[in-house]
Curated annotation (Swiss-Prot):
Pfam families: PAD (PF03068), PAD_M (PF08527), PAD_N (PF08526). Catalyzes the citrullination/deimination of arginine residues of proteins such as histones, thereby playing a key role in histone code and regulation of stem cell maintenance. Citrullinates histone H1 at 'Arg-54' (to form H1R54ci), histone H3 at 'Arg-2', 'Arg-8', 'Arg-17' and/or 'Arg-26' (to form H3R2ci, H3R8ci, H3R17ci, H3R26ci, respectively) and histone H4 at 'Arg-3' (to form H4R3ci). It catalyses: L-arginyl-[protein] + H2O = L-citrullyl-[protein] + NH4(+). Ca(2+) 5 binds at residues 351, 369-370. GO terms for biological process: chromatin organization; chromatin remodeling; innate immune response; nucleosome assembly; post-translational protein modification; stem cell population maintenance. The active site is at residues 350, 471, 473, 648. PANTHER family: PEPTIDYLARGININE DEIMINASE, PROTEIN-ARGININE DEIMINASE TYPE-4. Coiled coil: none annotated. The modification Citrulline is found at residues 212, 218, 372, 374, 383. Ca(2+) 3 binds at residues 165, 168. This is Protein-arginine deiminase type-4.
Length: 666
């Protein structure tokens, strides 16, 4: 809230002060009242509004003004109706009275000025003065909230540039300018006002490395935008002429919210009195605009797809052809990373997660680059980041990175309501160890801190360390569906698979085998059902998935009716450290690519019953009644044999939510 300095008056000599239009300035009546005074009256020029907070006046003075008692509860404020045309052109007279003293007067000469710092605090996309009752120095959530929003300028408008736009202190062009938030300083003063007064724009020193402010000046791009605040400068003294002026600023974020940064940045304009060169400058007035840096937001499977990413490598030509046909059916753009750029690293899902940032005036897709840094490490920087496509990462030391730091272990639910609490942007899901041990793996705390600090998609920790790779996308997915929730949660289910195989054996299909047409050992339904070792392994897997099932029901507000069990078997193998972990026994159907109503599902190569794969038939019977279309894609040799599936090998850029993140209440 804008604040003016307290004005003190004294009978000995006139007082001179500045009053900012629209701001109630405190006036100290009692501090220098003559000894013996018990009451006072006050008169002022027509352009000055005097407000006395007290009980009823004691009586009328001889001048016709009300007399007020001088008691400790007295509060007097002044407001100017308009800016002064010259210095000291408004006057306030205070008369003091006492039972045994004659009337004594104190004079106050006022200069009214208009001074305001405005930004888009109403979130309409345009900078304008805050409406009455809105304190622009605060930031509030919700549909009735207020406060300005700032984007991290993390895209790269110049394709030839080696870094993000915020990494330099220049405005490249008007497109670069559109990534920034406008802010305007409006002033109206007497012509010689700034001979004795100074305006200073400032940011707290602790926040100076989180923001950069450009001042618009006359001239051609880019020289007409001068850096006035940023990592090297926490304050800027404005040299202004008197009269009426408007000064435009453009503000860019330099850092996302994180464990050590809540995302709030106050920018303050201060008016200083420098009239006496022998004294330090005195603070006369301050106005502050509070900005919040927009969070990075993930998009769930229920959001419309816009672009699919995949790698080309020596073993996936047939897969690419199938994927191209599938994405064409879903009317979705397909971008293929060439082999020379991925260095045989086919795990596109693990390398990055594509989300977005948003302010009222601009929405920007932003890729979050994982710290795994294998063959695809340059792809997010060199091929995804660009004009109107931002980039963010959180670096880790190589020795600190585990498989759970890859982004197949980072998912987000559709919007949910949990025990009355709304999550209109869904909740982030990350995999972790169920309990700590010398061999346990977790997503690094630096990544978890970043995700939690965004505030709008409160993370949920799931148990995934039981898996060979350890990612949540190995046992769950979400698909759009009709109904109240608007989606279904798909969970891998050994129990459902055993039940199905048992029924088929009872019907006389025990000799039907998996992996028909593949160079794999023949495995019949009866072989699988008779293996106690495999049963024990899948009972363990089922217990792990059941644990997550209860967590998901509790943290996402789901019921059993919101969950579909996808038949799936696992087996236990040793990982690189020799620890027993689970991996899919046949291609993991829940690890699917969801493009609207079109599902690209790993072809399971299940037993053929009456000319059709019984696993495919079962999944279709579960999902097609929801209005979904199932396409089974052969990824056996290109992905499944390397511990991944269709979802692991692809990535999707999706349409941002229509819901505005600032309308929610975290």
């Amino acid at each position: 809230m804008a604040q003016g300095a307290v004005i003190h008056v004294a009978p000995e000599e006139p007082t001179h002060a500045v009053c900012v239009v629209g701001t109630a300035t405190p006036l100290d009546i009692r501090g220098s009242a003559p000894r013996g005074s018990t009451s006072f009256s006050i008169t002022a020029s027509p352009e000055v509004v005097v407000d006395v907070i007290h009980g009823p006046p004691s009586k009328k003075s001889t001048t016709g003004a009300s007399k007020w008692p001088l008691d400790p509860k007295l509060e007097v404020t002044l407001q100017m109706k308009a800016a002064s045309s010259r210095i000291d052109d408004q006057k306030v007279r205070i008369s003091y009275y006492g039972p045994k003293t004659s009337s004594t007067q104190a004079l106050l000469y006022l200069t009214g000025v208009e001074l305001s710092l405005s930004a888009d605090v109403t979130r309409t996309g345009k900078a304008k003065p805050a409406p009455a009752g809105k304190d622009q120095s605060t930031w509030t959530w919700g549909p009735d909230g207020h406060g300005a929003i700032l984007l991290v300028n993390c895209d790269k408008e110049d394709p030839k540039s080696s870094g993000m736009d915020f990494e330099d202190d220049k405005v490249l062009d008007n497109k670069d300018l559109q990534d920034m938030s406008p802010m305007t300083l409006s002033t109206k003063t007497p012509k010689d006002f700034f001979d004795k007064y100074q305006l200073v724009l400032q940011v707290p020193k602790a926040k100076m490395n989180k923001v950069r402010v450009f001042r618009a000046t006359r001239g051609k791009l880019p020289s007409r935008y001068k850096v006035v605040l940023g990592p090297q400068q926490f304050s800027h003294r404005l040299e202004l002429l008197g009269g009426q002026h408007s000064t435009d600023f453009y503000v860019e974020g330099l850092a996302f919210p994180d464990a050590d940064f809540k995302g709030l940045i106050p920018l303050t304009i201060s008016l200083l009195d420098k009239s006496n060169p022998e004294l330090p400058e005195a603070l006369v007035f301050q106005d502050t605009v509070m900005f919040r840096v927009a969070p990075w937001i993930m998009t769930p499977n229920t959001q419309p797809p816009q672009e699919v990413y995949v790698c080309r490598f020596s073993d996936n030509e047939d897969f690419l052809k199938s994927l191209a046909t599938f994405t064409k059916k879903a009317k979705c753009k397909l971008t293929v990373c060439p082999e020379e750029e991925n260095q045989d690293d086919q795990w596109m899902q693990d390398e990055m997660e594509i989300g977005y940032i948003q302010a009222p005036h601009k929405t920007l897709p932003v890729v979050f680059d994982s710290p795994r840094d294998r063959g695809l490490k340059d792809f997010p920087v060199k091929r995804v980041m660009g004009p109107n496509f931002g980039y963010v990462t959180r670096g880790l030391y190589r020795a600190e990175v585990t498989g759970l730091d890859a982004f197949g272990n980072l998912e987000v639910s559709p919007p949910v309501t949990v025990r009355g609490k709304e999550y209109p942007l869904g909740r982030i899901l990350i995999g972790s160890s169920g309990y700590s041990s010398s061999e346990s793996r977790d997503m690094h705390q630096i990544l978890q801190d970043f995700l939690g600090a965004q505030q709008v998609q409160a993370p949920v920790r799931l148990f995934s360390d039981w898996l060979f790779v350890g990612h949540v996308d190995e046992f769950l997915s979400f698909v759009p569906a009709r109904g109240k929730q608007g989606f279904r949660l798909l969970l891998s289910s050994p129990r459902a698979c055993y039940q199905m195989f048992q029924e088929l054996q009872t019907e006389g299909h025990g000799e039907a085998s998996l992996f028909e047409g593949l160079k794999r050992k023949r495995q019949t339904i009866s072989d699988i059902l008779s293996s106690q070792k495999l049963r024990d392994q899948n009972a363990y897997v089922e217990s792990c998935i059941d644990w997550n099932r209860e967590v998901l029901k509790r943290e996402l507000g789901l019921t059993e009716g919101d969950i579909i069990d996808i038949p799936q078997l696992f087996r236990i193998v040793g990982n690189s450290r020799g620890n027993p972990k689970a991996e899919a026994f046949f291609p993991n159907m829940v690890n699917m690519l969801v493009l609207g109503k079109h599902l690209g599902i790993p072809k399971p190569f299940g037993p053929i019953i009456n000319g059709r794969c019984c696993l495919e038939e079962k999944v279709c019977s579960l999902l097609e009644p929801l209005g979904l279309h199932c396409t089974f894609i052969n990824d056996f040799y290109s992905y499944h044999m390397y511990h991944g599936e269709v979802h692991c090998g692809t990535n999707v850029r999706r349409k941002p939510f229509a819901f505005k993140w600032w309308h929610m209440v975290p």
